[in-house]
Amino acid sequence: MKYNQYAYVETSPEKATEELLAINFLPENYSSLSFSELLAVLTGNVLAEATTRQAKDAKLAEFAVDDQTDLAAFLLDTPTAITASQFANVALQLLGYHPNYDYSLTDPLTCGEKHALPAFKDLTSKEELIFAFYRLLNTRSKNGQILLDVMAGKGYFTQFWGEGKFMLFNGKSLPVFDTSQVIREVVYVQSDLDTDGDGKGDLLPVTVFRPVESQDQLKVPALYTASPYFGGIIDNVKTNHNVDENLTDATTWTNPKYVAKPLVKSPAPSGQDVPATELATGQSSYGLNEYLLARGFASVFSGAIGNRHGDGIRITGSPEETISQKEVIEWLTGDRVAYTDRTRRFETKAGWCSGNVGMTGRSYLGTLQIAIATTGVKGLKTVVSEAAISSWYDYYREHGLVIAPSECQGEDMDKLAEVCQSNLWDGGNFTAKKAYEAEQAELLAAQDRATGQYSDFWESRNYRHHADGIKCSWISVHGLNDWNVKPKNVYKIWQKVKQLPVESHLFLHQGPHYNMNNLVSIDFTDLMNLWFVHELLEVENGAYEQWPKVMIQDNLEADKWHAESDWANDLGQASLYSPTADGYLSTVENGTGQLTFTDLGGTEFKKAGISETDWEYQFISGEKKWAKASLRFESEEFLHPTTLVGRPKVQVRVAANKTVGQLSVALVDLGTRQRLTATPKIFARGNQPFGYRFEADSLQEFVPDKATKAKLITKAHMNLQNYQDMKQPSKLEAGQFVDLEFELQPTYYTLPAGAKLCLIIYSTDQGMTKRPLETEDYTVDLAGTALLLYRK
């Protein structure tokens, strides 16, 4: 598998020598050493676990330069050069590869090529040797980290602990901060919001992890993770809403309104600054933050309103949620008051903070980055938003229907608010409990599970409509197989952000609702190190030009990444497909006639007792038990690999035999073959240290799985009563043909030669839609039905 490396910054030999001297890797007297002496010293310096020169020299005999000679013996002959093969053998062993198991000592260069390592060359001078080691320290090891990070995990940089300054190497920050003495504290930011109605501004607990060096003169930037889950998660999955019910006439919709909560203006910060008096007991919940904490970036967490030990109530996706999370940044930049404890007597300041703030986090934590960024708050320099919701309607609804996130049937805004209302665990907080119960009733009514229609309630939770307020640089990360936060969330915010005068990048991986910072195929953590050094330390290191604007992981070969200028329909050419009465999906023949299927609702699914995931696979694979409740149209086999890009669109002329109806459409890759695993395989658990005796991550990657018959590419759903307007329902008569036109979730998917594309038209999606208790007939007029794709 290829260890692709995008974060290495091209560096001159002169600059490389300067950086090696600065970290005490290259000895000051290097010019007086012979080639062989220098080779021994530099190799030994990689072995950070050996703390004396004698111990380092003793270990040289453990390394082979070829299949006959160890490094110590090789050095006895005082060589003045080393061949590419010999150096590759030493380098591969330093990188963690095992000779005779991972590669052959007689052919190490093939191993380097296999893993996409930098090319090894004959080294005939000390200058070449020095630069070769510089490049080696910046090369990804078998554990996925660059060799310098492996050395850090063994204690190499403890020699710099206590110096109280950032050190950079190849444009990235080094772990020179004492992780054994991290300051862990809690403060209480006062909000302008009074969401619990007690007449006082809500107090928001904020947990800070920062380098001990920031106690003195050093000011450090902050990585802020807005996490509603930080105070704890209330498990309420057993009380999720019932989805086994018939559809409701959507014309009963009343357009529920958003109603703002009262404000209580917080006092301006005074000159008082008392050190924090509460120790943090919560743990960091995001690996990238821990990695960068060892490199000098403070890590800040807050769940804001409704979180454990704080005030207020959770109001999922609301402007109040955005305001409360933004207020934490205002404290970090000196513009908002915070207290040492809940008595509100003593103010405490973030004097340790440089005023530069970046944001990190996935899912809800990524969502709040989008929300806060739209406010344009001072001090927020960049966001790295992973698997984020950009409109809450697109999370819990779609085209006039109640639609669940994957594996979350019955969840909704009110249930998620309860999950995150961790101050309910503070038994004495009766104020919050009473306000929470009232808010739950309001959320239940306003979210309108009866009709699923767009409303003012949902409009207030659409961050994309405020995208023009974004002033910070932007990185979005999303899984192309994420059916929790569906891909159109990132696609639609990307269409906005890419037009703004801010630097922006997009990463799309093959995962579901997942992180990508520890994949084999990309050095994402190193890229983020480079990025945050540029954005928060304000060091010009070429980060903006270092990698392509859009990077997309291939669905056939996990270690292949596509560089694109954008992610949009116009990456491809439009192709129109028509379904025909004999079950073909054709580019040359128009469909005629009508076909009918009978939807069984959730009755058969409930009887089967299988999971929603198992149902979906059996359904898309064409198992008769489930396929009979659908219409399936298959293309001819593709002669050449074909990549689908952007958002497919369908037009379906359909009639139902009832006055309500829901239509689902799926695109499926057919053909029995190996496909990538749904989630990455862990190669080694806990093998990526963030620093010395600190936290760690696990190397992982998608790998070929056992053969399957089919794979879902994309899908979408629509309420038949929205045939005239996506934002307003219309009356539907039984037997009335209506023309539905809607887009599917966006994709970037390569169909290999020999694959078939299958269009499935159905109604009940057991994992996402409501599951009616009665059957319903749907008749599709093929003359008014078509599929528009964009193909590369």
Swiss-Prot record:
Catalytically driven reaction(s): Hydrolyzes Xaa-Pro-|- bonds to release unblocked, N-terminal dipeptides from substrates including Ala-Pro-|-p-nitroanilide and (sequentially) Tyr-Pro-|-Phe-Pro-|-Gly-Pro-|-Ile
Disulfide bonds: none
Major localization listed first in the record, in broad terms: cytoplasm
Cross-referenced Gene3D superfamilies: 1.10.246.70, alpha/beta hydrolase, Galactose-binding domain-like
HAMAP family in UniProt: Aminopeptidase_S15
Oligomer status and interactors: Homodimer.
Name of this protein: Xaa-Pro dipeptidyl-peptidase
Species the sequence originates in: Lactobacillus delbrueckii subsp. bulgaricus (strain ATCC 11842 / DSM 20081 / BCRC 10696 / JCM 1002 / NBRC 13953 / NCIMB 11778 / NCTC 12712 / WDCM 00102 / Lb 14)
Gene: pepX
